[in-house]
Each structure stands twice: as structure tokens, then as C-alpha cells.
Amino acid sequence: MEEPPEEKPKVIGGPYNFWLYSPVSGYDITHPKSVSAPKVYPRLTCKTGSTHLTLAPNRTALVVVDMQNYFLSPALHRPPNSAGLQIAEKLKNVVIPACRKKKIPILWLNWGLTPLDILAMPPTVKRGFALDNNFVHGYKAPKLGVDVGPVQLEGGFTIDGGRVLMRDTWNEEIYDPLAALVVRGTDMKVYKNRLSGFTADTETDKALKSRGIRTLIFAGCNTDQCVAATLMDAAWLNYDCILLSDATATTSPKFAQEAVEYNMEGLDFKMTCKDLVNGQRVAGDVDF
């Protein structure tokens, strides 16, 4: 007995920006030219919750938020067994290799300040950094732009740590074990000067649009702060957003992570690292 044909997919959105949904195949967020246009290839189908999600890998980017030496390195008195370091290991061993294999571009989104940024920084941001207590050995959070002095790394050698989160300093750089994975000339790196990476004077939106990116997969820390702020702004700028739930972490209480994950159920999408790794990529003629 032949299976009944799949019903016509439901259109969610408008004529120029829409998803297609079918109870059988789940959500299609590949963004063909029109509802009646041929399917977009290549395409990648992943599990998300109780349904499936199909995206266009070359219109998608992994956004890695704030995985920087300042926030992660034990050399700066950060905890040696932090949730952020566990996320770094997962990115190194699972997520980034999966994105390379599936040909999903990567954008590294980092705090990177200029002297003008320090002068213009609002009290709310300065206060937030001053309240950071995710340090060991009684170390107190230095102010933005303050020189952290010499830093002793593994192996016993010492480097200049630089001023806190100022551009082109060691503490601002991508966390050392992850920096080794950056592909120069292929990966994107963008500086931000607020929790969100989409403020008016950042290059995030421009960098993504120049690559034709429509869908963003978020990883990094802190989930309820910089990740969530960037994700929400991205959604309002018409990007499709996916939270990689077990590749994000926060120093906040557990309920803060849970709240962001809960909100993603109604905003856009959530998936796990395993869902991404197991995603099925189908090649074909690309419809742009």
C-alpha cells in the first residue's frame, strides 16, 4: 500500500521572509526565492526537540560568543574547572569539527574595546563587569581598560596580559586552545562593545550579510547575558536563530540557563551538539 503524499507545507511569515512547516518533515528555514520555488541545496536536516529543522549550511553561521582568554583562562584566576572551559572543550572536539565537515561558516564574536569605547561605556556595563566574581584565590575583577600586568602561562613563560578587553591584547584574544582552530581568511571575527553583538557601531550584521547568512547557530557564554542579548537582537534583524543548548554556559544560577532555553521554544529553535553532528547534509544544485 502506497503511503499518502505529504500535505502541502504551511507558510509561516510573509512573501519575502518565510519558513515552511510540515508535521511530517518539520521546519524548512532554507529561504527559497518563493513558496513555489525549487528546494534550496545543499540542505542540512537536524533534529530539534520533537520535530526536525532543515537549514541551508552555506546560509548559516556558527556564532561563538565571548570565548576569550579574559573570561576563561585560569592564568587570569578563572576557575580551572569552569562551565566555560567545558564548553570550550565541546567546541574544540565536537561543534567546530562538525561545522567544518558540514561547511557551516564560523563567526567569532568577541569583546574588543577602543579608548573611545571606554570613554563612552555606560554605567550599566561598567557596573556589570565590576560585579563579576567568577575568580579564584580572592582575585577581584579589574575595571575595563585596566592593565592586568604580566600573566604566567602553562610552561612557566610570562606574557603581557594587556588592558582588560582592549583590542589586540592577549586577554582579549580567543581562548588559546580555540584560537588554534581559527582558519584565517575563512572564519569571521567581529569585535563588540556591549553585551549584544548587533549594536549600531559593530560590524556583525555587515559581516554576515556579506556572506548571505540568514541563519545563526549560537554557542559560547554567558548564555543569559551576551549570548541571549545577541540572539534577541539577531531575531529582530530577521535572522533565524538556533541555540546550541549544551554548547552554551553561564556563571549565573541554573535557572538563568533554563529560562533562555525555555524562551527559545517559542522564539526560534534549540538543538544539542548531538543533533548538529547527526544532521544529514544533502548536496545538489544550489538555488540562490
Model-identified regions with their sequence ranges:
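A short alpha/beta connector and helix-capping loop motif
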Residues: 58, 75-111
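Serine-centered coil/turn micro-motif
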Residues: 74-76, 124-125, 169
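Glycine-rich, phosphate-binding/catalytic loops in enzymes
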Residues: 79-83, 124-125, 235-236
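Active-site-adjacent betaalpha module
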Residues: 1-61, 68, 93, 101-102, ...
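Short catalytic/ligand-binding loop motif for oxyanion handling, primarily in non-cytosolic enzymes
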Residues: 115-118
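Short acidic, Gly/Ser-rich segments with clustered Asp/Glu that frequently serve as metal-coordination loops
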Residues: 68-74
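Short, conserved beta-strand edge motifs with alternating hydrophobic and charged residues
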Residues: 64, 107-110, 190-191
